[in-house]
Amino acid sequence: MRPHHRLPDQMRELHIERAVNCHAEGSALITLGRTQVLCTASIEERVPPFLRGQNQGWVTAEYGMLPRATHERSTREAARGKQQGRTQEIQRLIGRSLRAVVDLSALGERSITLDCDVLQADGGTRTAAISGGFIALADAIRVLMQQGRLKANPLRGQLAAVSVGFYQGEALLDLEYCEDSAAETDMNIVMNDAGALIEIQGTAEGRAFSRQEMNALLDLAEKGISEIMAEQRRVLGL
């Protein structure tokens, strides 16, 4: 039995609220159980130096946690003077995932930055940031289209992400912190709306896992991601 009595293939309660920031071109607050992540998308009419003059855009992300997003207060990374390796890895994952569904050449020479700030953490913050970040990104692109700054929609599809893993020998969908921290295997899966895999991050913490067990986790992830995508479409009015 899972700690909070969910079925093995049952997601936590999911809620996505759009347009929660009056300044950002796109924004979303995603709540997955007790995990809450605020995602904002900002448009800038410039690109990184390595893309200048190539008539190509860029999508990137930054990720952070509020000091009391976790059980005990953590010092702000700005106060430490440097980002932790975990933070850098997560924000690269978010940016890389979102770029997979954007035609950067159709975006023009501009950047969209997703800022993903964890308000409250109870497992699955990076996957929630990807799923919520997609909403913010889609709305920012919608603004560009409405303003006539884009000739064609650069969004090539939909994507979402979820965590899966083995906890006490059982394959589980959407791990909360108490499961994630004790899982024998932990995976983060990103997929698009064609059912294709964008990213698999998987680690065996307590024991190695077989190909058959990995397939079982992928099946769970596909189920969860389809549910998240249905909510994304509902929120976006698609």
Curated annotation (Swiss-Prot):
Binding-site residues for phosphate, renumbered to this chain: R86, G124, T125, R126
PROSITE patterns: RIBONUCLEASE_PH (PS01277)
One matching Pfam family: RNase_PH_C
GO molecular function list: 3'-5'-RNA exonuclease activity; tRNA binding; tRNA nucleotidyltransferase activity
InterPro entries documented for this protein: ExoRNase_PH_dom1, ExoRNase_PH_dom2, ExoRNase_PH_dom2_sf, PNPase/RNase_PH_dom_sf, Ribosomal_Su5_D2-typ_SF, RNase_PH, RNase_PH_bac-type, RNase_PH_CS
Membrane-spanning intervals of the chain: none
Keywords, ordered alphabetically: Nucleotidyltransferase, RNA-binding, rRNA processing, Transferase, tRNA processing, tRNA-binding
EC number: 2.7.7.56
Record's catalysed reaction(s): tRNA(n+1) + phosphate = tRNA(n) + a ribonucleoside 5'-diphosphate
Gene3D superfamilies the record matches: GHMP Kinase, N-terminal domain
Cited CDD domains: RNase_PH_bact
Domain of life: Bacteria
UniProt xrefs under HAMAP family: RNase_PH (MF_00564)
Family membership: Belongs to the RNase PH family.
Assembly and binders: Homohexameric ring arranged as a trimer of dimers.
Function: Phosphorolytic 3'-5' exoribonuclease that plays an important role in tRNA 3'-end maturation. Removes nucleotide residues following the 3'-CCA terminus of tRNAs; can also add nucleotides to the ends of RNA molecules by using nucleoside diphosphates as substrates, but this may not be physiologically important. Probably plays a role in initiation of 16S rRNA degradation (leading to ribosome degradation) during starvation.
Protein name: Ribonuclease PH
Organism: Dichelobacter nodosus (strain VCS1703A)
